């Protein structure tokens, strides 16, 4: 019953995500742009974006203060906030404790689980009519649950400062995927020049590959490349190239990353930017290819359709996106969702100016990752 509900809703509903990075786009550069990245037209666009940025920041701050004053009294009456999240327990505690400190009188509780566990639990509760949870803080789960009709629609008042904006699911953080390598195992001259280059036969035996069929970082990266390339043949050849490397696939990105750090592999396909920077600062032989654009995937604070404390859930989402909330998220090592928030994991700080990040915006992938993988990847990967 749950599976049928997911499939039917995935066809009926649409996911709209807007890529809103100042000075960046999701489109591949044209030949003219590649030859002349300093054209007067581009300079004008960049200058206009930079000039508008302070206004967007100020307007977002005003909008947050206004909605905060409106929501807090109602949220305080509700008295509680219940969060389900895929985040690490210490990370969930950091953001829920920070929220409770900012808004006294609202008690926070949480349950931590993997995305499939969250989806199954929420759908069971939704079909049973249970007002069990307020916020789903995760990456894949909110959009999958939206497709099943289990999420309420809420658009943040701070949308203009978001890198990835979804008009129904507030994006509070980003999963930024970087092409990562062990500096002792691979020289700079031998680095892959692009994500596509990783499938080059010369890297056979050097790559730690995430399982592309488990709906993890590699699968979302593939969804981002699928949209950017818009080329079935090119995409199919890339999957064939990865398969031809004949390397073991890994079920845990963090465990895979540790193997690359230890020198058992030279390349991590892919790794999360905050993990790479964290380990690099500790002096481990790890770095990322800064010339290869990162893939960005939204982490959202979706509101459950039957939330018992809807005002607290809205306030929590707005606080997470606010400057204070983003500082809390940054402190636990997760990437900001704002294009005006500068930290060591910000795209505009961690990558060269003008880097065109690759967003994951595919409708089917966001709503039903398994169906997307079964449609576009499985026939080649397992064929």
What are these model-predicted stretches?
Residues 174-175, 202-213, 238-243, 249-250, 280-307, 320-343, ...:
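Periplasmic-binding protein-like
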Residues 345-383:
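Extracellular/periplasmic bilobal clamshell ligand-binding domains
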Residues 142-147, 266-286:
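A ligand-binding cleft/hinge motif common to bilobed small-molecule-binding domains
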Residues 82-97, 108-126, 131-264:
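Extracytoplasmic ligand-binding site segments that recognize negatively charged/polar headgroups
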Residues 48-50, 65-76, 82, 86-107:
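Short, polar/charged alpha-helical segment
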Residues 178-185, 222-227, 297-312, 328-329:
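A bilobed periplasmic-binding-protein/Venus flytrap-type ligand-binding module shared by bacterial periplasmic
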Residues 95, 234-238, 308-320, 328-331:
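Short amphipathic alpha-helical coupling segments at ligand-binding clamshell hinges
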């Amino acid at each position: 019953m749950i599976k049928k509900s997911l499939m039917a809703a995935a066809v009926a509903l649409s996911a709209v995500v807007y890529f809103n990075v100042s000075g960046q786009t999701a489109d591949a550069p044209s030949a003219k742009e590649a030859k002349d990245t300093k054209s007067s037209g581009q300079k004008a666009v960049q200058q206009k974006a930079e000039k508008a940025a302070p206004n967007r920041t100020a307007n977002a701050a005003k909008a947050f203060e206004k909605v905060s004053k409106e929501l807090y009294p109602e949220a305080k009456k509700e008295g509680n906030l219940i969060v389900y999240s895929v985040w690490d327990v210490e990370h969930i505690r950091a953001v829920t404790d920070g929220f409770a400190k900012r808004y006294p009188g609202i008690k926070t509780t949480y349950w931590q689980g993997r995305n499939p566990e969250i989806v199954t639990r929420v759908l069971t509760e939704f079909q049973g009519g249970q007002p069990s949870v307020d916020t789903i803080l995760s990456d894949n789960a909110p959009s999958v649950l939206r497709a099943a009709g289990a999420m309420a629609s809420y658009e943040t008042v701070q949308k203009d400062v978001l890198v990835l904006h979804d008009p129904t699911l507030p994006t509070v953080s980003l999963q930024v995927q970087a092409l990562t390598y062990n500096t002792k195992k691979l020289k700079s001259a031998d680095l892959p020049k692009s994500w596509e280059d990783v499938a080059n036969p010369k890297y056979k035996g050097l790559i730690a590959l995430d399982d592309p069929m488990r709906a993890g970082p590699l699968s979302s990266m593939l969804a981002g490349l699928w949209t950017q390339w818009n080329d079935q043949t090119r995409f199919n050849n890339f999957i064939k190239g990865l398969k031809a490397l004949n390397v073991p696939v890994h079920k845990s990105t963090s465990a895979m990353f540790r193997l690359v750090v230890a020198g058992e592999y030279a390349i991590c396909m892919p790794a999360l930017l905050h993990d790479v920077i964290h380990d690099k600062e500790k002096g481990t032989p790890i770095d990322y290819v800064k010339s290869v654009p990162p893939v960005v995937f939204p982490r959202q604070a979706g509101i459950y359709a039957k939330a018992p404390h809807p005002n607290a859930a809205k306030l929590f989402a707005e606080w997470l996106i606010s400057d204070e909330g983003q500082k809390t998220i940054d402190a636990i090592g997760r990437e900001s969702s704002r294009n005006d928030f500068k930290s060591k994991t910000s795209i505009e700080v961690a990558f060269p100016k003008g880097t065109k990040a690759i967003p994951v915006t595919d409708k089917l992938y966001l709503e039903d990752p398994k169906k997307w993988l079964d449609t576009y990847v499985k026939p080649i990967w397992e064929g």
